[in-house]
């Protein structure tokens, strides 16, 4: 009794749920489960060492049958968090083959409506696809297996991702890459840790990288997330080959935020008003914003 027994399929150890990452045959539990998730697309990915965090405050615990640990998948993690009263939002499922407009692309078919959309340990390691128009109230990247969550066009020039007032929030060490047309809606905050980035980049349309159309009516406040310690790295926003289209927007860059325009050298660019606060940086890289659109309020604007 009390002896740790290894599950031959997942590599999990019974009794190994104390936040430590154990090692099985030279691989950590996390590596074993990541390999398993990648080899079997139908499975979600939820490392056992993350379950105590997901189940904090509830009485579900983890059940055993003799010396074998019951298999715990992404749906268990989702349900545990839901039963614990946590705001799980709409959690991205492991069905990366389905576009975000499909109910099965979300845990328990909980489609985004007024829910913030979450990428976490239950989510796929593969890019998420946008087919047609997809409306998300907001995006929260918590602790997926990958450092960079990619949301990209399925390949049509009409694909479009709408980001609403829920804005964007990234966990420390995580990045978000949007490779599809983007429409911004409402007053929203982008909360980005130092060293992390939100990138809007060319989308693959018929195997060609096409400029991204940026549209909508919004007021975007970009701030560096608190709690990053004494990090000297900026929170970054990168707009690469972006084509504003009927865009009515204002951007407020707070301290320790850096916005960079790429691939638009010599081109006139109308992103709306961009307020560069003290401690913020705007890199134009040769692009030519509309006269009067950049308002420097104590920050740095590099031509």
Across the structure, where does each feature detected by a protein language model lie?
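Residue-level detector of buried hydrophobic side-chain packing
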Residues: 1-2, 33, 76, 106, ...
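Solvent-exposed adhesion/ligand-recognition segments of exported proteins
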Residues: 89-207, 221-224, 238-245, 249-250, ...
């Amino acid at each position: 009794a009390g002896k740790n027994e290894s599950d031959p399929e997942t590599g999990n150890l019974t009794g190994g749920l104390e936040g430590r990452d154990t090692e099985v045959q030279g691989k950590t539990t996390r590596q074993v489960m990541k390999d398993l998730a990648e080899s079997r697309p139908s499975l979600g990915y939820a490392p056992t060492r993350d379950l105590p965090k997901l189940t904090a405050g509830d009485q579900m615990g983890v059940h055993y049958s003799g010396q074998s640990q019951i298999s715990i998948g992404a749906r268990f993690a989702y349900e545990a968090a839901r039963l614990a009263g946590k705001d799980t939002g709409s959690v991205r499922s492991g069905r990366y083959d389905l576009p975000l407009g499909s109910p099965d692309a979300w845990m328990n078919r909980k489609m985004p409506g007024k829910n913030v959309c979450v990428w976490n340990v239950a989510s796929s390691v593969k890019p998420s696809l946008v087919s047609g128009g997809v409306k998300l109230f907001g995006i929260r990247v918590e602790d997926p297996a990958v450092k960079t969550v990619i949301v990209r066009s399925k390949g049509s020039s009409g694909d479009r991702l709408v980001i609403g007032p829920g804005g964007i929030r990234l966990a420390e060490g995580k990045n978000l890459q949007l490779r599809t047309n983007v429409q911004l809606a409402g007053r929203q905050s982008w909360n980005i840790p130092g060293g992390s980035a939100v990138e809007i980049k060319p989308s693959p349309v018929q195997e060609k990288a096409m400029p991204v159309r940026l549209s909508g009516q919004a007021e975007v406040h970009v701030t560096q997330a608190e709690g990053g310690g004494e990090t000297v790295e900026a929170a970054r926003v990168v707009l690469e080959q972006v084509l504003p289209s009927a865009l009515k927007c204002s951007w407020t860059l707070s301290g320790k935020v850096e916005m960079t325009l790429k691939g638009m050298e010599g081109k006139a660019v109308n992103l709306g008003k961009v307020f560069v606060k003290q401690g913020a940086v705007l890199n134009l890289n040769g692009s030519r914003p509309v006269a009067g659109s950049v308002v420097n309020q104590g920050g740095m604007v590099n031509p």
